[in-house]
Design a protein with these regions (language model features):
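Electropositive phosphate-/nucleotide-binding environments in soluble metabolic enzymes
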Residues: 30, 34, 60, 119-127
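A glycine-rich, hydrophobic loop/mini-helix early in the fold
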Residues: 1-24, 28, 35, 39
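C-terminal functional extensions of proteins
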Residues: 81-89, 94-154
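Structural motif
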Residues: 15-18, 50-53, 73-77, 93, ...
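Glycine-rich phosphate-binding loop
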Residues: 64-92
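Gly/Ser/Thr-rich loops at beta-strand to alpha-helix junctions
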Residues: 23-28, 58-59, 81-85
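Gly/Ser/Thr-rich active-site loops/lids in small-molecule metabolic enzymes
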Residues: 34-49, 95-108
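Active-site rim loops that border cofactor/substrate pockets in soluble metabolic enzymes
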Residues: 41-70
């Protein structure tokens, strides 16, 4: 985060911060970030959500610094995944409890291949993400210690 951008991130008392990052596929973010947010936000009634942060040429770890600066309990990074042979536009979501600089990948949960058609549909991804968010708040952790075994698709 640049010094100028850091000044824009006003600390608050937030349950959740969303960071939208182009990552390795701007196409994925352009196609799927808004429909994904449209699916998940109505499921978060009563949550204190920080202003959405949009980042260019960003990686997942940026969410740690953004979430820490904003004083957020959880950060959810929506990011364009590395294009593959069959899917050049998959969106990934990385969820981190108590974001701060220095978090490692094993401290995050990931949903991947979110796209419609052909991947994890937005509504199902939203159900799974909200389940993970609630479980993270209850157990006060994310990552390899937080298993989504309690999630059953409809």
């Amino acid at each position: 985060v640049s010094e100028e951008d850091a000044r824009q991130l006003q600390r608050g008392n937030y349950d959740l911060t969303f960071v939208i990052a182009d990552g390795l596929s701007a196409r994925a973010v352009h196609a799927h970030a808004v429909p994904m947010l449209d699916a998940v936000l109505p499921r978060l009634e009563g949550w204190r959500i920080a202003p959405i942060v949009i980042a260019c040429q960003a990686r997942v770890a940026l969410g740690d610094e953004v979430g820490e600066r904003l004083g957020s309990e959880l950060v959810s990074v929506l990011i364009g995944e590395r294009p593959g042979l069959s899917s050049p536009d998959s969106l990934g979501i990385y969820l981190t409890w108590q974001p701060r600089i220095g978090r490692v990948d094993s401290e995050r949960n990931c949903l991947s291949n979110i796209r419609s058609p052909g991947g994890l549909p937005y509504e199902l991804a939203a159900d799974r993400l909200v389940w993970l968010m609630k479980a993270a708040r209850g157990q006060k952790l994310t990552g390899v210690q937080l298993k989504d075994t309690g999630f059953l698709p409809p």
